[in-house]
Amino acid sequence: MKTLFEEIKASIKNNYNQDRSFWRPVLPWGGVFTIKAGRKAVSCTPLYVEIRLKNTCTIDGFLMLLYVILNENESFPRELSLHFGREFVDCFLYLMDTYSFTTVKLLWIWDKMEKQQYKSEVHKASLVIDLFGNEHDNFTKNLENLMSTIQGSYCSNWHCPTRVQEDQQRTISINPPQEIPHGNLIRLAVDELFCSKIELCEERGCGGLREFSQRVFCHGAPPFVVLNMQHWKPEDLAYVPYYLDLSDHKYLLEGATLFNKEEHHYSAAFQIDGHWMHYDGLRNVNLILLNKPPEFLLLSSLVYIRATEK
């Protein structure tokens, strides 16, 4: 039996223009998990015999991207095991390979999310878990310390009340430049966050110059990074760079997550073997080859994978 990833690659290779869609639904929105309980389950309180998932698009697109990333490089599963745990990575890949889509969502919810990040209630004989919200809250912030970065700075004024500072961040949120210059805006914004620089110290009454060191990853360059782009306007995103330099490492564009404002719904785009695909778990035909970028969708995040060192 072929794995899901092998099936997707085969469908790309054997694709004809008449049919650009994958032959079966992948990670469909929501999900129902039936509990195979014995007789003793009757005495449980509260009693429910199935788990129903709602509004799972806040994790679906990233789960699809994570699956593709883990299959892109043979060293990535081992590296990510250091952050997520070997058991989680092995179980995640097995469940995706075998089309166990509801179970893989439950794996993420119970292993990586905090209880306060989602709503749950017992309705009749079902436990209903609702993931309505923001995908960066439900996924990106739960990536352990994978993308943690740190940047130090010191002020030239010896009397500065906080002369030496350290700024540590667990996620990478890229803000658009306040003044829109010419050139690659995303790369400029990334450089603003990561590169060394000298600025006027913002401490009240200081007046000194603050020198910032290069921002570096706390645990080495991760296999992939997620750039939070939800504060950007479409007109600022005319060009998306296919590679970025982050802390002396080159990263290549692998995919993106997209937001439909009217439906308050997330989807994802990613590439396999140079072909771009669009995944939308809410549609009946939810995995298709792209001729052009999806229209009327806002960019929520960009996902880059670390380039292989030659």
Curated annotation (Swiss-Prot):
Disruption phenotype: Conditional knockout in dopamine D1 receptor (D1R)-positive neurons improves working memory, long-term memory, adult neurogenesis in the dentate gyrus (DR) and increases dopamine D1 receptor expression on the plasma membrane. The synaptic plasticity of glutamate neurons in the DG is increased.
GO-annotated biological processes: cAMP-mediated signaling; G protein-coupled dopamine receptor signaling pathway; gene expression; memory; neurogenesis; NMDA selective glutamate receptor signaling pathway
Top-rank taxon, per record: Eukaryota
InterPro entries: C14orf28-like
Subunit structure, as described in the record: Interacts with DRD1, the dopamine D1 receptor.
Main function: Could be a regulator of the dopamine receptor signaling pathway.
Protein name: Dopamine receptor-interacting-protein 1
Organism: Mus musculus (Mouse)
Designated gene of the protein: Dorip1
